[in-house]
């Protein structure tokens, strides 16, 4: 039976690279040449090549969907809106899971606070507010900013609930939030007068 000497014991065993890892010992105990080891490595790399991109469109889309879903959940919890799944058969679990996912993904901005109606999308809410209430904008419930387009509103809500959410300064009298103390000072001067605000801001 021939004797074998392990040249690189720390390398992972692979059938394509066996020639580079194990060498038959002979009387002269010659080691393999560099070219045989490189050829074995090339064979190994050819076998393990992947056609999938490391960061594909589907990965980005999945990540964005999960991020939007988390933002919406936080919005629901903050506003105290409770969603229920009515009319779902308990026997059909697939339908129930799909319905739960759809209900969870419904954005909280579809709720009109003026007439307490719920709409299918934020664009429908914007149309409703423009026609019925003559207020063609969506208002942020945290900082009271107004937005005439839903894409602007959704981008703004990421500053409150997204992964890079900003910390805001809050007015003690009306509970409005501002991104810095200068905005809060301006709010004090305009809304509450310039009375004792220096003590509160310090």
Swiss-Prot record:
Subcellular location: Nucleus
Domain of life: Eukaryota
Gene Ontology MF term list: DNA binding; zinc ion binding
UniProt keyword annotation of Zinc present: yes
Keywords: DNA-binding, Metal-binding, Nucleus, Repeat, Zinc, Zinc-finger
GO CC annotation, single: nucleus
Annotated zinc fingers (C2H2-type), start-end: 110-133, 138-160, 169-192
Region called Disordered, residue ranges: 43-63
PANTHER family: KLUMPFUSS, ISOFORM B-RELATED, ZINC FINGER PROTEIN
Record protein name field: Putative zinc finger protein ZK686.5
Species the sequence originates in: Caenorhabditis elegans
